[in-house]
Amino acid sequence: MSRLFGTDGVRGLANGLLTAELALSLAQAAAVVLGHDQLAEGKRPRAVIARDPRASGEFIGAAVEAGLASAGVDVYDAGVLPTPAAAYLIASLDADFGVMISASHNPAADNGIKFFARGGQKLADDAEDAIEAQLKVKPHRPTGVGVGRIQRFSDAEDRYILHLLTTLPHRLDGLTVVLDCAHGAASGCSPQVFKDAGAKVIVIGAEPDGLNINDGVGSTHLGPLQEAVVANGADLGIAHDGDADRCLAVDHEGNVIDGDQIMAILALALKADGKLKDNVLVATVMSNLGLKIALREAGISIRETAVGDRYVLEAMRQGGFNLGGEQSGHVIFADHATTGDGVLTGLQLAAQVARTRRSLQQLATAMTKLPQLMINVKGVDKTRAQTDEGVREAVARAEQELGQTGRVLLRPSGTEALVRVMVEAGDMATATRICEDLAEVIEKRLALAV
């Protein structure tokens, strides 16, 4: 059987790959692996569970709760909450582990199960492997007083909101903010916390019905937010995805502010306050070169990682850094959160607008994005992308031409016979020409036999 765990837990079509039976079995296996220390002492481990509002979350969540309780785990059901809220509650309650039922930015038909370790930390690969291995072992099934209890956690959202408010460096009084909640998990808490922080709030995409999550709204569909910001004369707009672990923004003229620009604004603010640990930002190789150039001029260095927030988190933990993220809008404030938090990020960004009395558009000029083009070259031997002599020579020529004003990145797909070619340059014409030339070389040199 292929590995169940992907880059962000177990995810797939609800009632297709992700059945109630699998959810129950995964929960029983996780109870043994993540609750081992408590079970070994004859105690009941404690776990927090939350979900986004997609319809399938109810039966999958019920199956997970049944699996946990039947394996001797006391369950605290936090209901519909963002993924980062679940992580926060796991840490604040000192629970042994937690579970989030969500497929993030995926369509409503999909769902997922993501486990967190003690402290609200993402699971290491070896812990996921151990859970998969435990699926093949007879479940731990206590009886009598050994079975777990299930409790509804009535003030979970309030606790999360209070936590977010304590992180604010400045209130939002006088700001008008449009929030697009993607008909997702932040539909309740995000508008409330922005109001509590003093902003005038206009809300779209906050009427979840179980089937409309991410449907034409949210961080993957920014059109409605752009229109609402301009139509209402708002200062800025904030877009979440289905589980609110990411944030993209829109300035007062409707221009998109991506994760790189958000990180630039926040890194500079933290450095100015003397709060950016070691003056380092952690970002992935996909972040725009303009981010590195702007921060280097400000005395901030970037630690690059592979693509994926788990790699950003790993580098942050290893180096003790407190700010990192991705161009997609996953931004991690290690001083306040253990994972990407879209509501927290939106609050911090809005606070800088209020604090500096500069528009988001003005703040975003902190970095100049280099024109960037990506081409997916399909049907090629991706394993040779870094070793083929002809490809290496073509890349070297491109890098020599670009010099310090651009870069080339080849990324083999993890799941397909495909190589992604990304080029940044001082102008789009140059980026396009070089990217197309490299794609042609890769297609010719690495083509798979038909």
From Swiss-Prot:
Q: Which residues carry this modification: Phosphoserine?
A: S104
- Source organism of this protein record: Renibacterium salmoninarum (strain ATCC 33209 / DSM 20767 / JCM 11484 / NBRC 15589 / NCIMB 2235)
Q: What is its EC number?
A: 5.4.2.10
* Active-site positions on this chain: S104 (phosphoserine intermediate)
**What GO cellular component term, any one, is given?**
cytosol
Q: What does this protein do?
A: Catalyzes the conversion of glucosamine-6-phosphate to glucosamine-1-phosphate.
- The answer to whether keyword Metal-binding applies is yes
Q: Tell me, what is one Gene Ontology molecular-function annotation carried by this entry?
A: phosphomannomutase activity
* Binding-site residues, Mg(2+): S104, D241, D243, D245
What is the recorded name of this protein? Answer: Phosphoglucosamine mutase
- Pfam families named in the record: PGM_PMM_I, PGM_PMM_II, PGM_PMM_III, PGM_PMM_IV
